[in-house]
């Protein structure tokens, strides 16, 4: 109460009340408002000089007290034009003449900004510098140009005339700012009297004419075009002219005047005309003006959109209807009608193939017309392309998919399919280097050569999927080949990178199926050999004496898998000694994990056989299991170093020589292995210490079960990543690991989502065609397209693969409906806090509500969001925020983590916190203070079924409202995967990459 009374008394200049409060001992420097402004600030703003003197001299309050933004009472006096208070504060109150606040603003900046020429003159007379700059590079002259006060501008140009062409950090000159604010008299003074350069541009390429046209300052535009030599066709960095800016802002008089002055209609860098900009923003009058000046409404930009398309997409249906009506008399109507908007060939090909198998689109797969204007047309008709001369933007590229024979290309800047895609290259090397700490969890420095090994690991993994795709020869058909499956101690099962799950019963069942296939293959070979011998005997002996045939009816068949034509290599039984060999003091893995090596090698062939993709002549390279087990059972330092070199392209010897100066002679890089009995620290260079022996017979190049636990000595175990720094690991190590995990996780899904998938469809089509040509062999087996029907195990494995494939295809179909200009503008000029739904297709002319986002749509939007030019701190905190979202997904459900993400971004958007403040308090409010996530067990493990059932009642279902989900194509061709299924896959995939990161990064010796 006393605090509030003091603030009110200071504002009102009530010295008597302040005296009573002083006698009561209630006045002090701690009395401030919510912004940190004290009593002297409030008295100065109100212009009560006597109150200011009382507070400083009698109450002994500091006259130079600073608010939260660093402003002193002198700043308040300069902003309000209180000359007497400013003079007293500077001369007797302890304030500095050139004191700057947190943003670098001085009293002279504020006096010029608010148009107080008397204060400007006094400050300059007292010796205030006219060239003092803020953190943004603005001088007082720039502030005067914004204020519009000609006297202040003249005083400042007289004090320092060379500042007239000085630009800020964003490239704005005083003339640019005056034109942007519409101050014609200032622009005339700067150009005619001060010689300001009208051709100076901001960093985004905008000139003074562009700024005036964008803000709708008609008189300034006319004066600049008439009395200066500025060009009518001047473009900004994106190729936009003054016509584009005027049409975008709905400034019809400027648009009409520029057209009457002969300004040509030009396209921007992405093929958009001023009519596209006017229609996109719903400016009906501008559209009518442009059409009256003979601008063709049927022109398309590089994404294939007409102006009517953009108007319809953004919900301006009256504008879209008008543009379609005026386009009807155009002779272009003699050509076939346009295709549905937009018409990517990839989507059309996939839709035609799927409709052929299903007999037409079903209710779970709505046509793209639910997201876009409905046109009668042909879905597979290509779009006419206009010739563009401007290059594509550097931040956004588009993908083009080639012929259906399996080849594919990705041409930067080619947007013929309308598919807006992301840059698939990783972060700059400097950003990746910062994710690897310089000290381990014990505070010991990590050798720089070893740090560089880890940096190369992360770089190689972030680009692994692209290199695998480039090396693929056309036989790759699914996402399972992009990363090796691995045994998870957390889930007590085998996880795939997309969250696929294999349990003990699944492996036993697969082993039985593989054995049946091998037996069947041998029987077929014997059948062929017996038939050949019978033919020879019949040729040598008289026909009545010998009649030998082979009845194949009694040959064993693999039930449900007769379509498999590929030869499966025989798997030798694993040696019991090797399978049971365990490092001392280490808990052994389950016995059934000894079968993993041959099952993992055969899994891809088996699943491809289900899809009918394996050709009869395919001969997978075989490798004796005995050798594999022998290699995996002993992992000497030499093998580890060579594995690093082969997998990550890292030369340990070179790195160590580059980053570590030798005080003595270094031991050579011994090509032979270190002795198994050697101590850990005997080999000082050239190789790494020997790791504990693996617990199962896996190939040395594949992840070994149990490596995760042993490799994770970075202070964070594989089962959990603590939300806060523990005693062993500092906060930097914990946050760096979280960043690495989320980058690996999102990079894997992002690359898979934006890799052209037409090859998969083509391979399946060719496989089915070849199967049909086999004649009698194909007649003996059922058709390949149908999923396996015997038992739930093989069917659920097929369903896992199919679900992931259709999820990725669904993402491609959704992104085909996002105009590239929407992504460009969000990336170029973010307004407020960005959110994933802003990067998704509009529904009914508006972005999808955040509250209806499903998990897959959230991820799809986040892929695009992280491609924007974000500040370093915001990017880091968004990575950490994403980590917490996926970390708590399995325990709290999708809607809880979605609300948590929304709460954090809302706090930042409202200005109540900065990204640097973190979000630990909000996380504790949503998820509690427990640092160890209670991972759900797998109730389907014993039955061999993937956990695809509903979440516990405490968790809310993952999917949003059904209409929105259907409009965004969240149903697959298989017809049954839902939000809960996707949550399960994403949750397990996140666990997979957490353990993968722990295996890759080991900061111990």
Curated annotation (Swiss-Prot):
One of its GO terms (cellular component) is stereocilium tip. Residues 334-346 have a biased composition (Pro residues). It comes from Homo sapiens. Residues 333-444, 462-483, 616-644, 695-730, 773-795 are annotated as: Disordered. GO terms for biological process: actin filament bundle assembly; sensory perception of sound. It comes from the Eukaryota. GO terms for molecular function: actin filament binding. Interacts with MYO3A (via C-terminus). Interacts with MYO3B (via C-terminus). The keyword Coiled coil applies. Pfam families: Ank (PF00023), Ank_2 (PF12796). Keywords: Actin-binding, ANK repeat, Cell projection, Coiled coil, Hearing, Repeat. Its main location: other. Residues 468-480 have a biased composition (Polar residues). Residues 517-541 form a coiled coil. ANK repeats lie at residues 1-31, 35-64, 69-99, 103-132, 136-166, 170-200, 204-234, 238-267, 270-299. InterPro entries: Ankyrin_rpt, Ankyrin_rpt-contain_sf, Espin/Espin-like. Binds to but does not cross-link actin. Required for the formation and maintenance of inner ear hair cell stereocilia and staircase formation. Essential for normal hearing. It is found in: Cell projection, Stereocilium. This is Espin-like protein.
């Amino acid at each position: 109460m006393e605090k509030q009374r003091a603030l009110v008394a200071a504002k009102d200049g009530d010295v008597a009340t302040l005296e009573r409060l002083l006698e009561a001992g209630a006045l002090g420097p701690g009395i401030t408002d919510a912004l940190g402004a004290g009593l002297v600030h409030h008295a100065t703003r109100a212009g009560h000089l006597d109150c200011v003197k009382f507070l400083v001299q009698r109450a002994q309050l500091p006259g130079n007290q600073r608010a939260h933004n660093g402003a002193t009472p002198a700043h308040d006096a300069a902003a309000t034009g209180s000359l007497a208070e400013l003079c007293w504060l500077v001369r007797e109150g302890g304030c500095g003449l050139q004191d700057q606040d947190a943003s670098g603003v001085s009293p002279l900046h504020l006096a010029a900004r608010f148009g107080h020429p008397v204060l400007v003159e006094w400050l300059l007379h007292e010796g205030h510098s006219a060239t003092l700059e803020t953190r943004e590079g603005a001088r007082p002259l720039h502030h005067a140009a914004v204020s519009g006060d000609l006297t202040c501008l003249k005083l400042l140009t007289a004090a320092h005339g060379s500042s007239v062409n000085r630009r800020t950090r964003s490239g704005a000159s005083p003339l640019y700012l005056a034109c942007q604010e519409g101050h014609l008299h200032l622009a005339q003074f700067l150009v005619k009297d001060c010689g300001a350069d009208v051709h100076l541009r901001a960093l985004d390429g905008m000139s003074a004419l562009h700024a005036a046209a964008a803000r709708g300052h008609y008189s300034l535009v006319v004066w600049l075009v008439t009395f200066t030599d500025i060009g009518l066709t001047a473009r900004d960095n994106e190729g936009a002219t003054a016509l584009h800016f005027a049409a975008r802002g709905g400034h019809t008089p400027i648009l009409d005047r520029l057209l009457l002055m002969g300004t040509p209609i030009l396209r921007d860098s992405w093929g958009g005309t001023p009519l596209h900009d006017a229609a996109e923003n719903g400016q009906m009058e501008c559209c009518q003006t442009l059409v009256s000046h003979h601008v063709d409404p049927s022109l398309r930009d590089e994404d294939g959109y007409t102006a009517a398309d953009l108007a319809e997409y953004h919900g301006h249906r009256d504008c879209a209807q008008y543009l379609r009506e005026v386009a009807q008399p155009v002779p272009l109507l003699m050509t076939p009608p346009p295709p549905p908007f937009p018409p990517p060939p990839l989507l059309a090909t996939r839709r035609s193939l799927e409709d052929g198998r299903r007999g037409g689109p079903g209710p779970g797969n709505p046509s793209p017309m639910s997201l876009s204007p409905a046109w009668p047309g042909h879905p597979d008709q290509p779009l006419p392309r206009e010739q563009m001369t401007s290059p594509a933007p550097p931040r956004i590229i588009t993908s083009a998919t080639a012929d259906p024979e399996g080849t594919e290309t990705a041409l930067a800047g080619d947007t013929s399919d309308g598919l807006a895609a992301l840059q698939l290259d990783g972060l700059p090397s400097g950003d990746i280097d910062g994710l690897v700490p310089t000290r381990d969890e014990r505070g010991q420095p990590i050798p720089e050569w070893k740090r560089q090994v880890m940096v190369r690991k992360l770089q190689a993994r972030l680009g692994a999927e692209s290199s695998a795709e480039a090396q693929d020869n056309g036989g790759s058909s699914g996402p399972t080949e992009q990363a090796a499956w691995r045994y998870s101690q957390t889930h007590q099962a085998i996880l795939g990178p997309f969250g696929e799950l294999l349990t003990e019963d699944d492996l036993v069942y697969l082993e039985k199926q593989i054995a049946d296939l091998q037996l069947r293959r041998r029987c077929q070979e014997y059948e062929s050999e017996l038939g050949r011998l019978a033919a020879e005997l019949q040729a040598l002996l008289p026909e009545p004496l010998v009649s030998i045939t082979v009845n194949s009816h009694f040959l064993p068949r693999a039930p449900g898998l007769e379509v498999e034509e590929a030869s499966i290599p025989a798997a030798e039984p694993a040696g019991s000694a090797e399978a049971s060999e365990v490092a001392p003091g280490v808990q052994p893995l389950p016995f059934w994990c000894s079968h993993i090596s041959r099952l993992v090698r055969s899994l891809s062939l088996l699943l491809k056989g289900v899809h009918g993709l394996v050709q009869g002549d395919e001969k997978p390279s075989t490798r004796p299991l005995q050798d594999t087990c022998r290699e995996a059972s002993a992992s000497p330092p030499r093998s580890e170093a060579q594995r690093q070199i082969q997998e990550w392209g890292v030369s340990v010897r070179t790195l160590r020589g580059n980053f570590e100066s030798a005080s003595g002679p270094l031991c050579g890089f011994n090509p032979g292995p270190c002795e198994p009995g050697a101590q850990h620290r005997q080999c000082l260079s050239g190789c790494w210490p020997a790791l504990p022996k693996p617990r199962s017979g896996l190939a040395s190049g594949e992840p070994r079960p149990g490596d995760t636990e042993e490799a994770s000595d970075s202070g964070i175990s594989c089962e959990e990543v603590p939300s806060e720094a523990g005693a062993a690991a500092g906060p930097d190590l914990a946050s760096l690991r979280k960043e690495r995990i989320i980058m690996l996780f999102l990079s894997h899904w992002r690359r898979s989502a934006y890799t052209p998938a037409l090859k998969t469809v083509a391979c399946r089509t060719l496989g089915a065609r070849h199967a049909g040509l086999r004649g009698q062999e194909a007649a003996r087996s059922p058709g390949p397209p149908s999923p396996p029907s015997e038992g739930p195990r093989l069917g659920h494995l097929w369903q896992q693969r199919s679900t992931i494939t259709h999820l990725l295809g669904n993402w491609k179909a959704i992104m085909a409906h996002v105009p590239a200009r929407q992504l460009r503008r969000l990336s170029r000029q973010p307004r407020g806090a960005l959110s994933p739904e802003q990067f998704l297709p509009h529904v009914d002319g508006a972005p999808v509500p955040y509250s209806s986002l499903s998990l897959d749509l959230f991820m799809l939007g986040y892929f695009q969001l992280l491609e924007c030019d974000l500040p370093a701190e915001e990017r880091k905190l968004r990575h950490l925020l994403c980590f917490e979202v996926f970390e708590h997904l399995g325990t709290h459900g999708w809607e809880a983590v979605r609300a948590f993400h929304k709460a954090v971004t809302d706090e930042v958007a409202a200005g109540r916190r900065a990204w640097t403040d973190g979000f630990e308090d909000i996380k504790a409010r949503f998820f509690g203070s427990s640092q160890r996530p209670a991972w759900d067990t797998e109730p389907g493990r014993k039955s061999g079924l993937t956990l695809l059932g509903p979440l516990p009642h405490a968790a809310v279902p993952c999917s949003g409202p059904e209409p929105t989900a259907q409009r965004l194509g969240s149903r697959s061709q298989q017809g049954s995967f839902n939000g809960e299924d996707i949550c399960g896959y994403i949750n397990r995939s996140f666990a997979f990459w957490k353990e993968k990161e722990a295996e890759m990064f080991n900061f111990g010796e």
